[in-house]
Amino acid sequence: AMLKEGMFIQDRYEIISKIGSGGMADVYKAKDHTLNRFVAVKVLKPEFRKDKGFITKFRVEAQSAAGLAHPNIVNVYDVGEDNGISFIVMELVEGITLKEYIEKKGRLAVREATSIAIQVSMGLQAAHNNGIVHRDVKPQNIIISTDGKVKVTDFGIARVATSNTISSNVMGSVHYSSPEQARGGYSDYKSDIYSLGITMYEMLTGHVPFDGDTTVAIALKHLQEEIQSPRKYVPELPKSTVQIIYKCTQKSPDRRYSDMEELISDL
């Protein structure tokens, strides 16, 4: 059943309005009547509600993310099921995605892009220190709140993509996915570093480095093509900034930053 305004989940969360929709879930603004605050409730779409394996993964991911409390992460408060509806309750962040912000501004100044990259890195560092790899870092999954805080959202959801969501989901992400992910191989925190490098490229130039007509064409570019200098678009970019992007986006994970801490200190 569709969730409607005024409906309650677990007699606690009152649905106020739908605020977003992704490949596998809808997101609603809700009122938590126990703690008297507004929250975001993410609900698995009806077409996935019968898929036991999917529901289990949805819950495992939510629980792993729930252990993370960090100012640069959209925090997860609760996870559960009510009348066959699997849901995750999260911090409600008023703001826009980094993708929308880049589209609005065309491209970002070096100082601002660097500040955003540092905040994203700090959120990811907290996750990595807890053994959680995001696997889907992209401007669509980074929120800039109305008070200027930068928060990473949708943790580990990339890990739960089963065959039936790949088609709907991967297209948005393939521009940012690492060569090892494009190959369908093993991915770890070094993949997050790569995706953040691509995100930085887009922040600074307004373009993604690899584009094409199909998912496969773009994936092949991640595997085979050298990244073009961001100075092609913005000639005055500092050399140090360009070097950071190059180091994040090395084809071989071993040649990237060893961890977020090393990247943060360079930024």
Identify the role of each PLM range.
Residues K45-G67:
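AlphaC helix of the eukaryotic protein kinase fold
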Residues V79:
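Activation-segment/catalytic-loop signature of the eukaryotic protein kinase fold
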Residues I116-A117:
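Activation segment signature within eukaryotic-like protein kinase domains
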Residues H175-L267:
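C-terminal lobe helix-coil module of Hanks-type protein kinase domains
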Residues V120-I132:
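Protein kinase catalytic-loop region centered on the HRD/HxD motif
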Residues N83-T97, Y101:
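Conserved short submotifs of the Hanks-type protein kinase catalytic core
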Residues I15-G22, V27:
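Protein kinase glycine-rich loop
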